[in-house]
A protein has these predicted regions:
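P-loop NTPase catalytic core of nucleic-acid-dependent motor ATPases
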Residues: 1-57
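Conserved catalytic/switch belt of AAA+ P-loop NTPases
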Residues: 3, 31, 35, 74-98, ...
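Short glycine-/polar-rich loops that comprise or flank the Walker A/P-loop
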Residues: 10, 37, 57-59, 84, ...
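DNA transaction DNA-binding modules
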Residues: 19, 63, 69, 166-214
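Conserved Walker
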Residues: 41-49, 66-68, 84-102, 109-118
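Conserved AAA+/SF3 P-loop NTPase catalytic/coupling segment centered on the Walker-B
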Residues: 59-81, 112-121
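A short helix-turn-beta junction within AAA+ P-loop NTPase domains corresponding to the substrate/partner-engaging
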Residues: 115-134
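A short, charged helix-loop
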Residues: 128-146
């Protein structure tokens, strides 16, 4: 999906944790709420072009069970989060290009992935704990319960976004913003519009980045 003229950037979500912490399941659940459709998850292909092709067919690029991220994929993910493009010479042509553009939300999960600093600065990292045996559920039971809860979940999300948009449209002075300035400003509007503690989202993003550098 190319970037509409007035849309800013996203932040990535990285779920990590040991085996049995439901990393894949959690990203599937999140995607099913904000971007239902198939495939639920993707694995990186052999070429960064595959990322852009996949991004063009969804709103959330959900990358499952990654073990490492190469420099090329790191750069592509940063570009997709911020809204960018990738060009390649058109087959059987000497002077024509095929252009891929994308601006997508990205979910990543894996046991222990070392993110490079530029991607880390755009990412919220959450470490999950192992689910105790007595609390485990079958996929069928889990999804059945989720379907019952989805209307209330979506109602809460849409109400929060509506409050944020009202606040955003008022215009306000912001504190110093991160490199994801559009995301940062909207996060403040989200907090103000819903009566949440202001600055907590940007504080979490900053702490994630600093922890990732250690």
């Amino acid at each position: 999906r190319g970037r509409p003229g007035n849309r800013g950037s996203y932040a990535a979500l990285y779920l990590t944790g040991p085996e049995g912490s439901a990393k894949s399941t959690n990203t599937k659940i999140l995607k099913s709420i904000v971007d239902p459709g198939t495939p639920e998850t993707r694995t990186p292909g052999s070429d960064v072009r595959d990322l852009y092709i996949g991004a063009a067919r969804c709103h959330v690029l959900n990358l499952d069970n990654l073990s490492h991220i190469t420099r090329d994929y790191n750069d592509a993910l940063c570009s997709i989060i911020s809204g960018g493009g990738f060009a390649r010479k058109l087959n059987y042509s000497d002077d024509e290009e095929m252009i891929f553009e994308a601006c997508n939300m990205i979910f990543i999960n894996g046991i222990s992935i070392k993110l490079m600093p530029d991607l880390m600065s755009r990412t919220f990292q959450i470490e999950l704990a192992v689910i105790p045996e007595e609390e485990r559920k079958t996929e069928a039971d889990l999804w059945q319960e989720l379907e019952k809860l989805k209307p209330a979940i979506l109602s809460g999300i849409l109400t929060a976004l509506s409050n944020a948009l009202k606040e955003y449209q008022k215009g306000f002075i912001t504190p110093p913003l991160p490199r994801l300035a559009d995301f940062g400003k909207f996060s403040i509007a989200l907090e103000r519009g819903n009566g949440w503690i202001e600055g907590k989202t940007l504080e979490a993003l900053k702490n994630n980045y600093e922890d990732g550098l250690e």
